[in-house]
């Protein structure tokens, strides 16, 4: 998913789009999970963990590749969210997660490109 999305959209970020100059900085966000972090080992959901580790590391690689083009790439953990997957016991609401992620996207730039952050802006280890 992340790879094919990037493969499709990166050319548009590099060349600009109607109404945006090609020199305007582009941004690309990857939603991952702390369960893909190397510090969160465990035996549950190994395929999910592997897919999130891959997504996070792809974001880091894209950040390095796209930096010369002025495109920032961020990887984000949305939190443990009250969804069908997270359940009613999860720590935060969808709205809280979305609000935090929108703040992270707005702040995404060269200084935070290639960084894995929580929806609250805390840096996470890969």
Q: Whereabouts are the PLM-identified features?
A:
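PG/GG-rich flexible active-site loop of Rossmann-like NAD(P)H-dependent oxidoreductases
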Residues: 33-35, 45, 75-82, 123
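Conserved Rossmann-fold SDR core element
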Residues: 56, 63-76, 81, 111-116
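Active-site micro-motifs of SAM-dependent methyltransferase domains
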Residues: 11, 36-37, 80-83, 87
């Amino acid at each position: 998913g992340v790879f094919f999305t990037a493969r499709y959209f990166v050319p548009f970020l590099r060349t600009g789009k109607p109404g945006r100059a090609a020199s305007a900085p582009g941004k690309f966000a990857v939603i991952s999970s702390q369960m893909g972090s190397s510090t969160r080992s465990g035996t549950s959901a190994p395929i999910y963990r592997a897919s999130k580790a891959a997504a996070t590391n792809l974001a880091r690689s894209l950040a390095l590749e796209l930096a010369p083009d002025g495109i920032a790439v961020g990887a984000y953990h949305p939190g443990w969210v009250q969804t069908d997957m997270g359940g009613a016991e999860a720590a935060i609401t969808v709205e809280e997660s979305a609000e935090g992620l929108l703040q992270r996207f707005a702040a995404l730039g060269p200084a935070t490109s290639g960084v894995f952050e929580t929806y609250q802006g805390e840096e996470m280890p890969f």
